[in-house]
């Protein structure tokens, strides 16, 4: 095989794998998180953008209110872009979703569910976050 053909095949392979890799890096448009009664905290995977909508429900069977915390990345650090406390048996649907602060740049966001009180468990809650 000629050197020219070999270089051509290798470059084609690199391009193919590069394009494939790029498809797996893409962030989801919406994410969900489920806080179970045995967990003191739980977080969703990341969603990319400048701001988000988030909502959720805290089950009637929960023993505590749950903090719904929208977090975003700035450089190496995570910051809070919105936070609401939802009592047991209450929640918000997607039509009445909370909105995070708006940033002037795109970054990763995630939704964190954290029962009220230090290291508290005993809550069953669902949370959702989506691109605006």
Language-model regions: role of each:
Residues 1-26:
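Sec-dependent N-terminal signal peptides of Gram-positive bacterial secreted proteins and lipoproteins
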Residues 27-132:
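Post-signal peptide N-terminal regions of Sec-secreted extracellular proteins
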């Amino acid at each position: 095989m000629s050197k020219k053909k070999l270089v051509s095949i290798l470059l084609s392979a690199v391009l193919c794998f590069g394009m494939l890799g790029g498809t797996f890096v893409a962030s989801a448009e919406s994410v969900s998180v489920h806080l179970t009664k045995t967990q003191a905290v739980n977080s969703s995977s990341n969603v990319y953008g400048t701001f988000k909508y988030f909502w959720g429900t805290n089950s009637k069977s929960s023993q505590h209110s749950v903090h719904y915390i929208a977090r975003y990345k700035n450089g190496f650090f995570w910051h809070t872009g919105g936070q609401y406390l939802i009592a047991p048996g209450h929640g918000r649907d997607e039509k009445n979703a909370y909105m995070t602060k708006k940033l002037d740049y795109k970054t990763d966001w995630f939704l964190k569910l954290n029962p009220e009180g230090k290291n508290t468990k005993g809550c069953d809650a669902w949370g959702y976050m989506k691109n605006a």
